[in-house]
Structure formats: structure tokens, C-alpha cells
């Protein structure tokens, strides 16, 4: 499909919505047909391209193989569509990560203190502990209850980007079972 003489040449471009028909019994399949919907997400913004690569790698490493999930496909499609009509926003990436965790059943509980299973208090700060949840903590880098409510509601514009990124990375790392994401190290080298 990559060779210029192939009848599929040009159809398999990154972030383009296509329907593939393939056959084969092993993991290496034979491509039989491509039906492209002509939805082209050719946003060449370096940050959005990195985000696409990161999301694709994340999905490959976190999902079991060969199990279709319509809700996850719709989530992915909405993420890709968001960058075809606007510029890159880190909040969109964080929303995708949080929504992905929810769809996979690893969603974060933003309502209770995991140590004593009580409701969060307004005057307390909370630290996220992977596989456990939020716990009361006096560290300045932690979230207030008001911030956690905003994150739960996906109102991320006023949330500190570094704290939010640390939160999603910790939650996702717990789901990856020690698998590294190469796209993160690649982006660090580029920036």
C-alpha cells in the first residue's frame, strides 16, 4: 500500500478515516480493500501531530488486541476532529486521557477521600495516589476540592497544566503496567 504503483497508494495517510477490509489468520494481515471517507485531518501543527502519535501509541499499549469498542472509537474520532477545526489545546488532550480512563473502567473518583471514604472537604488539599485515589495532603502542589470538581466536569481551562498533566500521567501509568511510551521521550528530545 506504500508503493507508488499500489492501487492503495495515497489512501493510507496519517489520521485519515478509512474502512479497511483485510484477511489472514496471523497478526500480519493482507489488505484487500480501502474505503476512505475523504475526511482528512491534515493538521500539520507539530503539537497536534505529537498528540496524535501519543494517543495512538497509548491506545496500542493499553488496549487488548482485536476487541472492537464503538464508544472508544467515537472518543478517538472526536479528539481527532477537534484539531481539524481548531488549534491544539492541551485541555483537549487531558480530556481525552480522562475520558479514556472512564471508558476503560479506570476512571478517577473525584468525590471521596480514598483513605477514609469520606466526601472531600472545601478547605483541604488532595494528592492523587494511583490505583487508590485522592488522599488528604498539605503539600502545595496538590488539588483543592474546587479544582477536582472542575476536573471532574472537564472544565480544565483554569486548572494548572502541570498538575493536570501529572495527574493524568500517573493514572495512565498505573494502567500501562510498566510499559513505556516512546512518544513521550521523543517529544522531550524535540522540545
Language-model region placement:
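Non-catalytic alpha-helical scaffolds and adjoining flexible linkers that form interface surfaces
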Residues: 1-191
